[in-house]
Amino acid sequence: MTAVDDAANPGPPSQHSPLRRTRLQQIAPLLITLACLLASAWAVRDLGLTTDEPRYIDNSQRIHAWFGDLFAHGPSAAFEEKRLAEGWYYARQESKNLPLVSLIGSLGHFTLGFFDSPPHSYRWGNLVILAVTCGVVFSWVRDELSSPAAVVAVAALIGMPRLWAHALLMSIDPLVASFQVLACWALWKSRQDDQLQTGFSNWRWPVAFGLLAGVGAMAKPTFWLIVPAWVVWGVLTGPRRHWRTATCLLTVAPLAALLLMPPWWSNPIGGFLGYIDLLLNDPVGWKIDVYYLGHVFQAELVPGTRPVPVPWHSVPLLTSITTPPWILVLVVMEVAGWSLSLLAARLARRAGRGRATPGRPGMALEGLWLIAAAVLPLVVMLPGTPAHDGTRLYRPAFYFAAFLAAGGFERLRLRWIGDNRPRISWIATSSLIVLAVGTNATIHPAGLSYYNSLVGGFTEATQPVALGHSLPEPRRPLHEVSYWWELFNRERSRDAGAPSTGARLTFFPRTLREADAQGLGASP
């Protein structure tokens, strides 16, 4: 056993995970899931059609028509090359997305969305995935830390307005985040079952991990970036304990991903390599203008000139000003505590001249949360990496930040409250719940425009200041208002149809035109 493996040993099961749970404790994850589903179903009604949703809905309708042909005319007609390309409009120059968002949206549309109308009916799939994620987050943290920490994890998850509002939309990045969380959960369960189970039951969680990883891989290429992180974590925490999960990652995951992409069935390797070539050699795709600190980056402002990349510090800066401060504090506490614990374990091993020394229970688990949270922000910070749309591209980091916040809370709870004063623990937990709900309620439905008190909130963050003449307007805000157009809902649309005398109306015509074409009722 290596030094790192000793330091990262998860130790015995948590004392907060009793072998016998009450009925309420058993159904608590389900109650959390249902509560999150109801809350999201209420909140989503206030969000208008956003920039990318018309395209996703159009692609969903193409799939519906393709399945109609499959059942009406049989496989020979549906799998004809031209018809397959029309029905599965993905991984191409005009639509670089992968099909998961449309498949999830379609499932929601034909189940819970059956009782709703577009565009909200297509959002139900994402709402269900969000609710399931909340239930898994609660269950996982409760089993490994404590019930109060589990509640704090869910409060942190729904208490980040940008995360919450983004997850309500028919959008890809929340699916990337949720399936990364679910796959990490299955990965951890696989590690535990390797110690506790024997025979065929040892394969349950590795297979589940492979399925979740494969499905998540068809959300977006950013999902793939967590795979090296899993490999590093597995090597550092004992590779012999993860051979089953590694096997399923190499076999089950590719098959699950391929199942969701019929155009690649006839030539899986060629289809995948062609998609990679498209991503790497697209001359236009990454020249997306970025507004950061009052200036425009990453855009070809003058034809033929090389776009200026977004500075690396956009990631830590935007993260620090778009996350509620109490979550930032708890995350810092957890990262600092985990780092010091790892350092102490290494020093103890060195002092013991190679003798095994027990690490802090949970080191491997917290390391998994930390590496999963760090991988995408670190990639986006690399020179030349696309960094458009604020924090959207590394949204999964904020999901794992909820776990880290729970870990930070648990450290403080054990240090200052302990297990003998549960009432005080629940008072502290309830206070954070109120804070999380209040933060979202006060800014709803403008969650995607949230800025915290470190920059004076939304008002100060978007206050025009003198910035010189690098752009036509010398006075402009340092930070941008939402670019999603989610606030242009039906109510605002009616207001726009009857503007006040002398008022000027500015809107994004493509979104309205596509909405009208699909009968989504977004324009006045």
Residue ranges and their predicted role:
Residues P13, R142-L145, A183-W205:
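Membrane-interface transmembrane helices that cradle and orient dolichyl/undecaprenyl
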Residues Q25-I32, D116, V137-G159, A177-S178, ...:
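Transmembrane-helix signature of polytopic, membrane-embedded enzymes
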Residues R45-T51, D69-L103, R123, Y291-P307, ...:
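Membrane-proximal lumenal/periplasmic loop motifs of glycosylation machinery
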Residues T50-T51, R162-L175:
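Short acidic/glycine- and proline-prone juxtamembrane loop motifs at membrane-interface regions
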Residues Y56-N59, H64-D69, E94-N97, V215, ...:
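Transmembrane-lumen/periplasm boundary regions of multi-pass, lipid-linked membrane glycan transferases
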Residues A153-I158, W185, A213, A217:
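Short helix- or helix-capping micro-motifs
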Residues T439, R476-S523:
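Short periplasmic/luminal acceptor-recognition loop of GT-C membrane glycosyltransferases, typified by
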